[in-house]
Amino acid sequence: MIELTDVTCELTGKKILDNVSLKIPEGQTMVIVGSSGAGKSVTLKHIIGLMAPDSGKVLVNDKCIHDVKARELENIRNHMGILFQSGALINWMSIFDNIALPLREKTDLDESSIADKVRERLAMVDMQGTGEKMPSEVSGGMKKRAGLARAIVRDPAIILYDEPTSGLDPVLSRSIDTLIAEMQKRLNVTSIVVTHDLNTAYYVGDRIAMLHEGQIIINATPKDFAENKDPVVQKFVEAQHLAQT
């Protein structure tokens, strides 16, 4: 389980997170939505341990990640996979080497076992036969898929997605949504998806939490979120509909 309790964060005098509390049960997908600047990515950084709250606690499997020693924090992160907004592939490495990198740096697997694992993960994201290509030779959607393959290559218990469909057209966005849902079922992981795309939220989320002015104003099932009468939630939903018409 991942749990945030009364997390507060200020940056340059502005309160970005204001007593945020959120529980993500093991094996579920929590989607965090909100407008730009609402604190979505800052929340993700707290969960990863890249930022420590000014007050409050962030627990991952009952361990307070901003109080543990560096080695223990590294161990916690070793059980996380992260899909960055851009895919974050290393430009001078092939797709294969990008995906193999965590295995080479963090495990004692031999090259034959690494190759088997990389090919397996490429197949899971429908990128068979692309391992020798360079990032510059593949589309934005394929970069995201390769980034996802790298995120899951060490069998993480937790996967974090930062704007997974950002910059993609609607067709490619839905294909990434399908992959996220498939990974959840096949790997039985706990997932957190930060997005501004409600189509993604409705498709992959067990629950949707919305950040507004640094606070969680709703934490609900996709159905209840869509039907919620809170004016801030309704305005966000309506703005999404307008953007897609």
Please report, for each region that a protein language model flagged, where it lies by residue.
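Conserved ABC ATPase signature
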Residues: M134-V138, M142
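A short, proline-enriched helix->beta-strand linker immediately N-terminal to the Walker B motif
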Residues: V153-A157
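Conserved ABC ATPase "signature" region
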Residues: K63-C64, E111-T130, A181
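Short coil-to-helix segment of the ABC ATPase nucleotide-binding domain corresponding to the Q-loop/switch region
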Residues: W92-L101
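Helix-to-loop junction immediately C-terminal to a conserved catalytic motif
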Residues: I48
